[in-house]
């Protein structure tokens, strides 16, 4: 009996201990992590906080749309397809549209334009087996540009300056063989503008090669030749000035800029100006920074792209999001993106961001500094469309101020945009954990209820008098917090 009396209280106490341990083990929200130290605030939260009217706020910057993917369909109808979509894009907060290469390539009706043959055939000459380009006729393109301008959209031309393709065969004394370097009215240049021959490609009596990487070596355009400069950007009817003054293009996306010197971009821009971005396909941020400094124009931030791929896919480690990128060094010249026509068709999974991780990547680029680009196929994907539109609205309204990384580890990434006197800014919280996560963070907002403007969580905490608040991220997702009214 004495043993029983002693054992019963002991068992009761043990049950209490076990019960307490079970409660901790079942807790799916981690409220113990504390970025700034101190105790997690326990403040009342209103049941129905009133969201800000985001239309009353402006970040001062919008978003560009890449309007194509590789081998778009239907062929010959793409300009009309885009004309049907530009009004919706403008309403969503897009301010520029990047069109595919608009002129005739060697592959004719199948060409995506990166095998340029006739720089002035916008779909009006019968050559390479077709009158229209893959995308349609010149008239349809002009209608698209006109409609876009009426909606306040700038139109960006895709320009291939490095190489040509689709010319006729001629004897080339510099190579001592026949080469496909003859471009005239009968050979791939029906417009008769900017006829070319072997003297306009490397090697010739002006230069053996340029300072860029070699690509399409037999038809590698020699920009040192004065005739080439005249036709590409100097003459009043040059490619640059014709595209701007006759066709109405507002800016430029330069293809494969590794293939020629930075001075080519400088000379082009000195003649026609406008927004410009270069495709320098390199994940090394230092390479991108040097190129931007040399040319004075923007570059696609491939360094940021690969950091996102490493963070979300390859290494599953969000620390990579805080790595070195063009955006971190020169955000005003960084054009960020999640996918493009090249990455999406790449069979190497390390060169594309997995579909299941794309929305976290879009949340990243649409809350950070830099100029975001949306990929056509992602925006038009019904599974992504509404979410991307919401992120664009958040970007265009609240993505303001300096970027401060509040916390980063393998599974969590928290970033604050400081805002300014007229704009509260935001906090991004990305988590790849399998359960809901919470973090205690320091904000600029005192005694105010917060709301996740992405709509991914309904948790609405209130900050204390010092701006401390606990925010929440859903499992394997993100939230974007800012103040309420």
Predicted segment positions?
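Bacterial Sec-dependent N-terminal signal peptides
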Residues: 1, 14-54
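Bacterial N-terminal signal peptides that target proteins for export
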Residues: 1-8
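Short, solvent-exposed loop/turn and secondary-structure capping segments
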Residues: 76, 100-101, 108-112, 159-160, ...
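Substrate-binding cleft of carbohydrate-active enzyme catalytic domains
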Residues: 133-169, 173, 177-179
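A short alpha/beta connector and helix-capping loop motif
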Residues: 168-192, 196, 265-279
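Alpha-helical scaffold elements lining the catalytic groove of polysaccharide deacetylases
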Residues: 224-239
């Amino acid at each position: 009996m004495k043993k029983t009396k002693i054992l019963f209280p002991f068992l009761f106490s043990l049950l209490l201990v076990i019960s307490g341990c079970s409660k901790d083990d079942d807790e799916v929200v981690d409220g113990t992590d504390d970025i700034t130290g101190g105790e997690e605030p326990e403040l009342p939260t209103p049941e129905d906080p009133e969201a800000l009217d985001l239309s009353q706020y402006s970040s001062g910057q919008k978003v560009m749309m890449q309007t194509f993917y590789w081998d778009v369909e239907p062929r010959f109808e793409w300009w009309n397809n885009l004309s049907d979509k530009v009004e919706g894009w403008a309403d969503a907060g897009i301010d520029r549209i990047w069109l595919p290469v608009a002129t005739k390539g060697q592959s004719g009706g199948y060409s995506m334009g990166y095998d340029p043959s006739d720089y002035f055939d916008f779909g009006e000459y019968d050559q390479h087996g077709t009158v229209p380009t893959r995308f349609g006729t010149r008239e349809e393109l002009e209608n698209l540009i006109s409609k876009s301008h009426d909606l306040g959209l700038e139109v960006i031309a895709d320009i291939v300056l490095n190489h040509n393709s689709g010319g006729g065969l001629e004897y080339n004394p510099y190579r001592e063989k026949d080469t496909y370097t003859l471009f005239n009215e009968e050979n791939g240049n029906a417009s008769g503008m900017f006829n070319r021959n072997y003297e306009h490609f490397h090697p010739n009596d002006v230069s053996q090669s340029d300072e860029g990487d070699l690509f399409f070596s037999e038809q590698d355009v020699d920009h040192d030749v004065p005739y080439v400069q005249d036709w590409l950007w100097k003459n009043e009817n040059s490619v640059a000035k014709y595209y701007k003054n006759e066709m109405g293009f507002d800016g430029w996306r330069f293809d494969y800029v590794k293939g020629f010197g930075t001075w080519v971009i400088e000379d082009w821009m000195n003649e026609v100006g406008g927004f410009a971005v270069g495709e320098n396909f390199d994940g090394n941020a230092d390479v991108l920074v040097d190129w931007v400094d040399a040319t004075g124009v923007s570059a696609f931030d491939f360094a940021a792209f690969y950091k996102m791929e490493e963070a979300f896919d390859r290494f599953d480690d969000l620390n990579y999001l805080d790595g070195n990128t063009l955006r971190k060094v020169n955000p005003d010249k960084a054009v960020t993106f999640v996918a493009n026509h090249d990455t999406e068709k790449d069979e190497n999974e390390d060169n594309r961001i997995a579909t299941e991780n794309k929305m976290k990547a879009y949340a990243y680029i649409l809350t950070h500094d830099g100029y975001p680009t949306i990929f056509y196929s992602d925006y038009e994907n019904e599974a992504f469309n509404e979410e991307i539109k919401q992120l664009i609205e958040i970007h265009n309204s609240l993505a303001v101020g300096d970027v401060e990384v509040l916390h980063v580890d393998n599974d969590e990434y928290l970033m604050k945009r400081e805002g300014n006197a007229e704009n509260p800014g935001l906090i991004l919280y990305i988590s790849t954990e399998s359960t809901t996560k919470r973090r205690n963070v320091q904000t600029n907002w005192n005694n105010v209820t917060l709301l996740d403007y992405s709509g991914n969580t309904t948790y609405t905490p209130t900050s204390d008098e010092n701006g401390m608040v606990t925010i929440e991220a859903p499992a394997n997702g993100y939230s974007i917090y800012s103040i309420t009214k």
